[in-house]
C-alpha cells in the first residue's frame, strides 16, 4: 500500500499472515509516516519509504521498520537500528521556528526553517505588488463577469427607478445620482439613499414610518465622504469588465470619512449593487403597506368599533350566565 511516493512494503518471515492483521499494521505504519514532517518537507518523502518485517516473537507479530533498499541501503537483520525513526522525530520536534516577514507588512506567518521559498512560491520568485496587479488582469474571466451582471440585472426592481442604471454604467456620475426613486402604485414617490437609511438605523419604527409617509428623508450631510461636497465629488471612470479596483476605497476617502456602502461597491466593481436595490425596494414597499393599514385603522368608523365592543361584552355576559345555570343544575342533581 502507498500514499503518493511514500510506500510501505510488508514482508512476513513466518509464512502467510492474517489479512486483517496486515491491514491494521499497515494503517499504523502509514499513520506514523503522515504524523511526521512529510507535509513540511516533501523532499524527504523518498527517505520515508520503508519496509515492514513481521517477526514471530513468542506468538506475537511485531513489525520492524527498515528503510527501503533504494534510499538508505540494506540494513542486515538484527543489526538494524530501531531507534532510527525516533531520533529523526525528536530532531524535527526540537527544530526552531522563525517569523518570516512577507511583502505585505502586518502579515506574519510562522514557518519552519527551510520552508520560506515554498511559502513565497514554488518557482522561488518574489513578485512585487505592481507585477501582481498586472498579472491579475491577464487571468481575469470576462465571460464570468458578463454572467454575473446579467443575473444581477434580473434581480433589479422593474419599473421602480428612473433611468439611474444607465447613468451608473456610463461612467462618472455625481454623488446625488446614486439616489434611487421608487414609484408606488398610489402615485407616491420615495427617494432612497443607502447612506441615509444606514445612518438613520437608530430611529424607532414610529419615526421611520413618519419620515417615510412624508415622502422624503432629512439629509444627513457630512456623514459620508460621498455626501460631503456633493457638487464637486465625482465617481471615477470604470472600464467595463475590468478587475475590481479596491484601491479606490483609499483614494476617495475624504477627511478620514468613508463612502457609503452603495458608493464603495460602485467604485470597486463599476456596477451598482443590485442586491442592495432589491432589498431597499422590498423594505420600502413593506413599510408603505404597513403604514397604509395603520391609517385605515385610525381613520375607521368609531361607531363600528363601539358596536364591536358591545358585541364582545354581550358574548361574555352570555357565557357567564351559561356557567351559572350549569352549576345550579349540578346542585339539583346532587340533592
Curated annotation (Swiss-Prot):
This is Protein IBD2. GO terms for cellular component: cytoplasm; spindle pole. It comes from Kluyveromyces lactis (strain ATCC 8585 / CBS 2359 / DSM 70799 / NBRC 1267 / NRRL Y-1140 / WM37). Residues 311-320 have a biased composition (Polar residues). Part of a checkpoint which monitors spindle integrity and prevents premature exit from mitosis. Its main location: cytoplasm. The keyword Cell cycle applies. Belongs to the IBD2 family. Residues 321-335 have a biased composition (Basic residues). InterPro entries: IBD2. It is found in: Cytoplasm, Cytoskeleton, Spindle pole. Keywords: Cell cycle, Cell division, Cytoplasm, Cytoskeleton, Mitosis. GO terms for biological process: cell division; mitotic spindle assembly checkpoint signaling. Residues 203-225, 296-335 are annotated as: Disordered.
Amino acid at each position: 500500500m502507498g500514499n503518493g511516493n511514500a510506500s510501505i512494503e510488508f514482508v512476513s518471515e513466518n509464512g502467510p499472515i492474517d489479512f486483517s492483521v496486515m491491514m491494521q499494521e499497515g494503517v499504523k505504519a502509514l499513520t506514523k509516516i503522515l504524523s511526521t514532517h512529510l507535509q513540511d518537507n516533501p523532499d524527504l518523502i523518498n527517505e520515508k519509504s520503508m519496509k515492514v518485517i513481521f517477526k514471530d516473537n513468542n506468538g506475537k507479530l511485531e513489525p520492524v521498520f527498515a528503510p527501503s533498499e533504494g534510499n538508505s541501503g540494506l540494513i542486515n537483520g538484527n543489526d538494524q537500528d530501531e531507534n532510527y525513526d525516533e531520533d529523526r522525530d525528536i530532531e524535527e520536534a526540537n527544530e526552531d521556528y522563525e517569523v518570516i516577514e512577507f511583502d505585505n507588512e502586518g502579515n506574519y506567518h510562522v514557518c519552519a526553517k527551510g520552508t520560506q521559498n515554498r511559502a513565497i512560491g514554488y518557482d522561488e520568485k518574489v513578485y512585487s505588488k505592481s507585477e501582481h496587479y498586472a498579472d491579475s488582469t491577464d487571468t481575469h474571466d470576462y465571460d464570468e463577469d458578463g454572467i454575473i451582471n446579467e443575473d444581477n440585472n434580473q434581480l433589479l426592481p422593474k419599473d421602480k427607478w428612473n433611468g439611474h442604471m444607465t447613468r451608473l454604467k456610463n461612467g462618472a456620475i455625481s454623488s446625488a445620482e446614486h439616489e434611487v426613486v421608487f414609484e408606488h402604485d398610489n402615485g407616491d414617490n420615495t427617494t432612497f439613499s443607502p447612506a441615509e437609511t444606514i445612518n438613520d438605523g437608530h430611529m424607532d419604527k414610529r419615526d421611520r414610518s413618519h419620515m417615510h409617509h412624508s415622502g422624503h428623508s432629512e439629509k444627513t450631510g457630512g456623514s459620508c465622504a460621498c455626501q460631503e461636497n456633493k457638487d464637486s465629488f465625482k465617481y471615477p471612470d470604470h472600464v467595463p469588465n475590468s478587475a475590481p479596483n479596491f484601491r479606490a476605497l483609499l483614494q476617495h476617502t475624504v477627511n478620514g470619512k468613508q463612502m457609503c456602502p452603495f458608493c464603495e461597491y460602485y467604485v470597486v466593481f463599476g456596477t451598482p449593487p443590485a442586491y442592495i436595490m432589491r432589498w431597499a425596494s422590498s423594505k420600502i414597499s413593506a413599510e408603505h403597506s404597513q403604514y397604509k393599514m395603520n391609517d385605515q385603522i385610525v381613520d375607521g368608523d368609531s361607531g363600528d368599533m363601539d358596536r364591536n365592543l358591545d358585541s364582545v361584552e354581550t358574548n361574555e355576559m352570555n357565557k357567564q350566565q351559561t356557567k351559572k345555570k350549569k352549576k345550579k343544575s349540578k346542585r339539583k342533581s346532587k340533592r
